[in-house]
A protein has these predicted regions:
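Flexible, acidic/Gly-rich N-terminal and inter-domain linker regions that tether
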Residues: 1-53, 63, 101
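Canonical Radical SAM [4Fe-4S] cluster-binding loop centered on the CxxxCxxC motif
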Residues: 49-85, 176, 180
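Short beta-strand motif preference
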Residues: 55-57, 169, 570
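C-terminal scaffold of the Radical SAM
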Residues: 76-98, 104-376
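Short helix/loop capping segments that flank catalytic or ligand/cofactor-binding pockets
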Residues: 315, 323-325, 416, 515, ...
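Basic, glycine-rich polyanion-binding accessory segments appended to enzymes
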Residues: 342-416
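Short, amphipathic alpha-helical interaction segments positioned at domain boundaries
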Residues: 410-434
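Eukaryotic intrinsically disordered, low-complexity regulatory linkers and tails enriched in Ser/Thr/Pro
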Residues: 435-577, 582-606
Length: 606
């Protein structure tokens, strides 16, 4: 830091792990075949209120796409406001007629997207509808997530008058130059002045800050904290910036338009500085990322409870929820959601909860509040070994008389990685083969989605739709696809090898993505395999392929991660990807056009 603070390992341990990564949200779930979804929904919905729950309403619109954000879905249009609000209210009303039980909603969260993009009258009536159709607890925390654009003080006051009691504003940083590069229209001084006025209304006001942003020096981070704590805020959230591959900012970094974000050495120190500074200023740490100032009403209830797998009712396009031992996602395609017949739940994904999912909720909740119950891993030698290693690394404090170990500042910073590693020590659950053919409706929706954005991760779409990789390929725009018989695998592999030029060979499995760039070696068939010649030099592709498993070969030409790509995709009899071969690039980083033409000719020959 600017003040040259020397942190102890308990405060900052930047070299503890090579990466800081959480589990996928769907981890621990057992996929349920699509034909069963509606029956399960009808059986479970009457019992949704058998216990207390949370409610999440998703507003999937943004006025612009901030380059650091991975939650952008739909561009905002004023015409959406009343139509979308009507549809969510209709969705809530239909479920209210069926639900039974005495459970209460302990927290409501309007997330997005940008919920505050809705027009004032629509946002207010959606809040009132929650009180009409949901069993809201007397002490319910009711949060509206928003940003300064489209959310003036009058609209904020209308939200409070309608029944909200907590407002969360994503500031990220008060540094004007960084804000502008991130896609934020207002400068830092404007943000500060806005928050001063917002804090005058009778509500809990929370601000989100990010650390580890590109160009965010230690001095900038210190100033961000100073400015935030100078405001009469109730809560303050500090999140580490993650450079996920699909974010627009990643393309900017690759092209040199934005500097690379700082590494863990800086992030860990900035987190330690935030924890230390906020404690000195009288703030209480209520979770790994959340801080509350005493006697200003901040409870952080939703953010803490949602990680414990407490039931959460989901409403709106793209919203995710769970109850009755299963998780689900509401249809994320906006047009499809808006066209949902009255009284129906348009479900896009459903999975059952395995015992591992239940345990994950306990571990996540405990670690969010800064502790770990060792008894949860009794008999798990692998987990116990990890915990002992982490204690030696000084990520934990000594075990207390209550059987809990406390995470210190370093442990809390690395908690996503700790949770991930602990859960991956558990035995995997046997899963039914739930892969199925796409329905005509699914095909239409996938085609529309891929027409808008053909650069999506096809493997992820296959998992979400419980279909094969090949089924997703067939939904790509026609100008992206060429197909030939799988029986030509040997011919095509030998043709590529004859180029004597570098290509990229990729094998993508559920457990790894392996890439090798170099000349593809020749090969020949023998003993049921296509056997690559093994060159004397080290490295390169070598091994054996069950060539008879190849049922189809596709040439895909499409954008991916901001770049043009051209690749051969070899498909097995189950519709899965055996491997892929991507066209090489020249010294300027451009695809080699003569390789593209050579691949096309291979398919013209068919």
């Amino acid at each position: 830091m600017t003040q040259q603070i020397v942190w102890t390992p308990r405060q900052s341990a930047p070299k503890a792990f090579p990466e800081r990564q959480a589990l996928m949200p769907i981890w621990g779930g057992i996929p349920i075949p699509r034909p069963q979804w509606q029956n399960i929904w009808r059986q479970k919905l009457p019992h949704a209120a058998d216990s207390d729950a949370l409610a999440y309403l998703h507003i999937p619109f943004c006025a612009n796409h901030c380059v650091f954000c991975g939650f952008y879905r739909n561009a905002w249009k004023e015409s959406y406001s009343s139509v979308y609000t009507d549809k969510i209210i209709e969705e809530m009303a239909a479920e209210a007629e069926i639900r039974q039980g005495n459970g209460k909603i302990r927290a409501v969260y309007f997330g997005g997207g940008t919920p505050t993009a809705l027009q004032t009258q629509d946002l207010a009536r959606l809040i009132r509808a929650c009180y009409q159709y949901l069993p809201i607890a007397d002490d319910c925390e009711f949060t509206i997530e928003g940003r300064m654009s489209h959310f003036d003080i009058e609209k904020a006051q209308a939200c409070i008058e309608a029944g909200a009691n907590r407002i969360s504003i994503g500031v990220q940083t008060f540094d004007t130059a960084i804000r502008r590069r991130l896609g934020r229209k207002h400068g830092g001084d404007e943000a500060f002045a806005y928050l001063e006025k917002l804090c005058e209304i009778n509500a809990v006001i929370v601000v989100d800050l990010m650390f580890g942003l590109p160009n965010q020096t230690d001095a900038v981070w210190q100033n961000d904290l100073e400015r935030a704590t100078a405001l009469p805020l109730s809560g303050l959230d500090t999140y580490a910036f993650n450079l996920y591959p699909m974010l627009p900012i990643n393309r900017m970094v690759e092209k040199g338009a934005f500097p690379a974000p700082p590494g863990f050495d800086v992030q860990a120190d900035q987190y330690a500085y935030a924890v230390e500074t906020l404690a000195q200023k009288g703030w209480n740490q209520v979770s790994n990322s959340h801080f509350a100032y005493p006697d200003r009403g901040e409870r952080n209830r939703y953010n803490t409870l949602v990680k414990s797998n407490i039931p959460c009712w989901a409403f709106g396009s793209g919203a995710g929820g769970n109850f009755g031992g299963f998780s689900y996602q509401v249809q994320g395609d906006l047009d499809s959601y808006l066209a949902t017949p009255k009284g129906e739940k348009n479900i896009a994904f459903m999975s059952g909860h395995s015992p591992n999912k239940t345990l994950l909720g306990q571990v996540q909740h405990d670690m969010e509040t800064g502790c770990l119950n060792l008894s949860l891993f009794d008999g798990n030698a692998a987990a116990q070994k990890l915990i002992a290693q982490w204690q030696a690394m000084q990520l934990f404090e000594e075990q207390g008389s209550d059987g809990l170990i406390r995470l210190n500042t370093s442990g809390r910073y690395w908690s996503p990685t700790l949770i991930r590693k602990l859960m991956l020590t558990l035995p995997t659950q046997e899963k039914d083969q739930t892969m199925q053919k796409l329905s005509s409706e699914q095909q239409i929706m996938l085609r529309q989605s891929l027409e808008k954005n053909p650069g999506q991760v096809l493997e992820m779409l296959a998992a979400q739709n419980q279909c094969s990789f090949e089924d997703v390929i067939r939904c790509l725009p026609e100008n992206c696809i060429r197909q030939t018989e799988g029986s030509r695998i040997v011919e095509i592999l030998q043709a590529v090898a004859a180029w004597d030029e570098a290509v990229t060979f990729i094998a993508h499995t559920p457990d790894a993505i392996v890439e090798v760039t170099g000349k593809l070696p020749g090969g020949k068939v023998g003993r049921g395999f296509y056997n690559f010649d093994h060159p004397e030099t080290d490295g390169g592709v070598h091994g054996h392929i069950y060539y008879e498993n190849c049922a189809a070969i596709y040439l895909l030409e499409r954008p991916f991660m901001g770049k043009d790509t051209c690749a051969l995709n070899f498909i097995n009899r189950n519709g899965g990807a055996m491997f892929k071969i991507f066209v090489g690039s020249d010294e300027a980083g451009e695809l080699k056009q003569h390789q593209i033409e050579a691949m096309r000719k291979l398919f013209e020959a068919a």
